[in-house]
Amino acid sequence: MLQVIHENLSAAGLDSFAYVGGRAREGFNPTFRHVPDEIADVGDGEQSSLRGVLAALTHAWTTGLEAVVILGCDVPLVTTNTIQRLVSALDVSDVSVAECDGDHWSILAARVDIREHVLAQYLAGRRAIHRALTDLRISRVVCSTTECTNVNDVATLQLITENRLSDV
């Protein structure tokens, strides 16, 4: 599923790629770098979505990037159009989040300069992304229910893809 996400990010015109957490994948596209959660340097060893966001922001900050697009590994159906709209929304906000029957915080883009804010929220005990980012300028980007579909394995991804192709 990471391969599909990589292809969608690349097709959206992005040119720096990383996946956060877990173990490094062998034989994976070398342009898609593994970033360990530990890069966040919070020292607690706890795993959380917010720590993953903090790790992504820290990696982007250390590599001189201005913004990040963060997609959970279980949302591989996000379109290039939505990715581009998330990035464009950063012209007027600190964070842009996918919206489909509510905010979908595993699909977002953020300016790297929010890193210190996210770190402070994490150190204050917050772990929910939406609570940590609530006092920032947030844009909501409408997307389809398909894009927000939680896909937990390759077989499900293939089935959804086949069904989408048969509907065309």
Residue ranges and their predicted role:
Residues 1-106, 112-126, 134-147, 151-155, ...:
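Nucleotide and nucleotide-moiety/phosphate-recognizing core
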